[in-house]
Amino acid sequence: MKEGIHPTYRKVLFHDTSVNKYFLIGSTLQTDRTMKWEDGKEYPYMTLDISSESHPFYTGEQRVVSTEGRVANFNRRFGALKGKV
């Protein structure tokens, strides 16, 4: 591998702000902010809006979406006009 062209791989502290959970994960993400972790060391810090800790797919809190199609919706709205025009 060529020297100097690959990003630096290091531990980064991610914070899911929606559920206030922290994750220490290896990443190549570049950030200027740092934060002290439970082990007393300072790590690069990045906030997240959503992660596996808060996403409905992973938490099991999925909504059931109606599978009714666009044609059925059209027929429901305008089906009564079928023979009148």
Curated annotation (Swiss-Prot):
Pfam family, one: Ribosomal_L31
Gene Ontology terms, MF aspect: structural constituent of ribosome
PANTHER family associated with the record: 50S RIBOSOMAL PROTEIN L31, CHLOROPLASTIC, LARGE RIBOSOMAL SUBUNIT PROTEIN BL31C
One GO process term, biological-process aspect: translation
InterPro entries cross-referenced by the UniProt entry: Ribosomal_bL28/bL31-like_sf (IPR034704), Ribosomal_bL31 (IPR002150), Ribosomal_bL31_B (IPR027493), Ribosomal_bL31_sf (IPR042105)
Species this protein is from: Aliivibrio salmonicida (strain LFI1238) (Vibrio salmonicida (strain LFI1238))
Swiss-Prot/TrEMBL keywords: Ribonucleoprotein, Ribosomal protein
One GO location term (cellular component): ribonucleoprotein complex
PROSITE patterns xref list: RIBOSOMAL_L31 (PS01143)
HAMAP family, A to Z: Ribosomal_bL31_2
Homology family: Belongs to the bacterial ribosomal protein bL31 family. Type B subfamily.
Domain of life where this protein originates: Bacteria
Annotated protein name in UniProt: Large ribosomal subunit protein bL31B
Paired cysteines (S-S): none
Ribosomal protein in keyword set: yes
SUBUNIT field: Part of the 50S ribosomal subunit.
